[in-house]
Amino acid sequence: MANAIIETAKERFAQSHQSLSREYASIRAGRANASLLDRIQVDYYGAPTPLNQLASITVPEARVLLISPFDKSSIKDIERALNASDLGITPANDGSVIRLVIPALTEETRKELAKEVKKVGENAKIAIRNIRRDAMDDAKKQEKAKEITEDELKTLEKDIQKATDDAIKEIDRMTAEKEKELLSG
């Protein structure tokens, strides 16, 4: 039962890391990357649909994304969704494909994005600490219910803390990597 607490916490830590990774992928670093468009939803026949289900997204040049809709009639809907997004990039529609030219980042923009990366990283650490708190509470409940001994509780708390420390180190690594990518341009 004690192992189940740690395994559950580790699974939740991994989910937090995946979520952070997706969040960082959507922060543009001055280079074209199809993952920039992962969170774009297009109103397609009245239903919000992920852009990558309506079009192929390619990177023909370092700072250009090419969006080729599978259904040419959806091009206006895709363009509308891109304009409404918070990307800050104006789409160029030539009737059959949409081009997104990623502007070069200014030094000021890079610093702003680096601040955003730190903030997102801090939020991920808070989530990790909340998971740790839940795991510690579960362990204490088991000890109160006499399912584990006091010594087992102490060992379990140490294991939970070690897993938490490892998860936070991984967040720090991911954050430093993304900041370096942004600031090195």
Swiss-Prot record:
GO terms for cellular component: cytoplasm. It comes from the Bacteria. One of its GO terms (molecular function) is ribosomal large subunit binding. It is found in: Cytoplasm. GO terms for biological process: translational termination. Keywords: Cytoplasm, Protein biosynthesis. Pfam families: RRF (PF01765). Belongs to the RRF family. Responsible for the release of ribosomes from messenger RNA at the termination of protein biosynthesis. May increase the efficiency of translation by recycling ribosomes from one round of translation to another. This is Ribosome-recycling factor.
